[in-house]
Amino acid sequence: MKQTIILLYGGRSAEREVSVLSAESVMRAVNYDRFTVKTFFISQSGDFIKTQEFSHAPGQEDRLMTNETIDWDKKVAPSAIYEEGAVVFPVLHGPMGEDGSVQGFLEVLKMPYVGCNILSSSLAMDKITTKRVLESAGIAQVPYVAIVEGDDVTAKIAEVEEKLAYPVFTKPSNMGSSVGISKSENQEELRPALELAFRYDSRVLVEQGVNAREIEVGLLGNYDVKSTLPGEVVKDVAFYDYDAKYIDNKITMDIPAKISDDVVAVMRQNAETAFRAIGGLGLSRCDFFYTDKGEIFLNELNTMPGFTQWSMYPLLWDNMGISYPELIERLVDLAKESFDKREAHLI
């Protein structure tokens, strides 16, 4: 009997379009000799819509439902995703997806799911909290100032100018895929950058700009996590924003990255240490800055990285000899393993 994968995609965050791309890639790459795929779309308003089922590879004409093609007659209660023995693959990016909220819902339903648990998902989603945890683990961070809604913005700007040097990057603490992030060269640019970031979150990070290469390491496993050789994001734009990353195709990837063996070893070790520090499970992508001065800063952990067949995370593992379909199978097996352990702890 085939194993059922419940594919959750869409979602309420600004990254829902990326989620659809990732989900369509997964549904086409699944080993249909072993799996059946059932898909549920989460609309922008948070409704669950039962969409397609696939017992064999979909045709090129098959497309997943989106906000533009919703069939509201297929709206179901969120708990309708439950199926005995099924594994959920929540291909959801950003808030209300990889921030622990969906993970908590799936644990209430007693369903195995791919990826990090409630704690590690919520922790890694918040940039300020992640920095504090990684600092405690001895991992170097880019200098920053945290600003919370209600703070005296003028005083905080003065703190930024005392502790950091322009240019600086302003980021919502709880957001991903470069949404709401701005680069500021002076105070006149910093004020509107803060206003933009506060549209997406009540906690904002102002980070020192660094002249650096962006290097990424893939992580796979539960308590025996393994890392990939690093890959590099090679940009044709000054700032790797949402449109550059997902829409304009203004980046290329260099896998493996052209860096020394010593730097590779440090990055892989730091990535594995960071994954353990947050209590990670299943998968993550660890993003580093490698400066022109030879400094290595861990920028962030992404607990549900972009998962299209052309995304960095699957390509990093392909370079290590694990194909995209095999990667999906391994993640499903890891989900079942962590579920069994979680259930055993409740006895």
UniProtKB/Swiss-Prot annotation:
Identify the domain of life. Bacteria
Could you list this entry's UniProt keywords, alphabetically sorted. Answer: ATP-binding, Cell shape, Cell wall biogenesis/degradation, Cytoplasm, Ligase, Magnesium, Manganese, Metal-binding, Nucleotide-binding, Peptidoglycan synthesis
Location within or outside the cell: Cytoplasm
Instruction: Report the main location listed first in the record.
Output: cytoplasm
Record-level Gene Ontology MF annotations = ATP binding; D-alanine-D-alanine ligase activity; metal ion binding
* Residues reported in the UniProt entry to bind ATP: 161-216
Q: What protein does this entry describe?
A: D-alanine--D-alanine ligase
Origin organism of this chain?
Streptococcus pneumoniae (strain Taiwan19F-14)
